[in-house]
Curated annotation (Swiss-Prot):
Organism: Oryza sativa subsp. japonica
GO BP: signal transduction
Gene3D superfamilies: PPM-type phosphatase domain
Record-linked InterPro entries: PP2C (IPR015655), PP2C_BS (IPR000222), PPM-type-like_dom_sf (IPR036457), PPM-type_phosphatase-like_dom (IPR001932)
Keywords assigned by UniProt, alphabetized: Hydrolase, Magnesium, Manganese, Metal-binding, Protein phosphatase
Annotated protein name in UniProt: Probable protein phosphatase 2C 65
GO MF term (any one): metal ion binding
Top EC class for this record: hydrolase
Domain (PPM-type phosphatase): residue spans on this chain: 47-343
Cofactor(s) demanded: Mg(2+); Mn(2+)
Binding site for Mn(2+) 2: 85, 290, 334
Amino acid sequence: MGCAQGKCCVPRRQRGRGGGGAVGGRGGATLGRVAVPGAGLVLEYATLAVAGLYPDSPGRESQDAHLVATRFAGHPDLHLFAVFDGHGACGAACAGFARDALPRLLAGVGVGAGEEGGGRMVVVEDPAAAFREALPAANAEMHAADEVDDSMSGTTAVAALVAGGALHVANVGDSRAVAGVWREGRVAAEELSWDQTPFRADERARVKACGARVMSVEQVEGVRDPEAESWVADEGDPPRVWARDGLYPGTAFTRSLGDQAAEAVGVIAEPEVKSVEITPAHLFFVVASDGVFEFLSSQDVVDMVAAYEDPREACSAIAAESYKLWLEHENRTDDITIIIVHIRDSENVDKFLYRKRIPSAGSCCCAMAVVLALQSVRHAPVANPLGAVARVFLRAPAD
């Protein structure tokens, strides 16, 4: 969910609808593997990025960015996975800037000549502290960069760093990270980040203390009581952050990188960081943009990942289901970026045998067709692009 100058600010019930769907298939996802020798783990990871469908802007550039940096900073036990969701007129540039800046700044925190000439890397000794310094530094660099106009544009950032036997997640904004944890015979969702939006009472109070108004678009327009704080998440008209005497910035989040004009009303780049010990019960984790979580809960996503042995299949299943739900509720889809990381060791690998099904060849082909259709209608002069995508969904073979 973006800002008033970026992603849609029209309440959801006033928007159009699309049609049906199916899940499954690899759909262009990429696969990689890397060892974590200090913890005896192997990470098997997949990434998938699909640009959103905006009928009024065919060929629109995706504003998401992501990175995978294995053996981060030259350390065999450090592996970084991050997603950035840009917003505003320069959202793509902001997301790309953050993607490029974060690894450099994170690796550089605390580096200097030691007593014996060696460098001290905080990211190795205290990853959470390194994140708390690097993300605000990326924000400051973005403000100063001539090539990026972040006055009314910016990006979220959610980054997961595997550091030996621990997982450290830093979040700024409303992208999300979640782990799948084996508990009592099932895979449960463990939140690794918390969406920073005005729905949260603590974040709402913080920005109000900085002089912000917190209202939905309909409250600003006088359709609803401006004093009411009874927003419903699935209504599609979320509370937003506004200047006291202006119709800006209109952000549906309370923290971000960039958004220089919003800083005066409390939209900050300070991350929240969660650190967890990786146990044999931790089967995988997911890092994704809010294009995934707009209509899917964290448990929904975890259930879908758990149903597929190949993380590429899971990426495409989640993307296809997310697109289906977007088209059922709106006349567009958001950009979607997903990183899935399986955590393998000798103790937890057998737990993957509980999976509900193996995707059929038909479902694999279906998801690939969905992704390819979405990409093709974005760039082709189709009279009804949403209808074209819906036809692909409706032709999907049943498992």
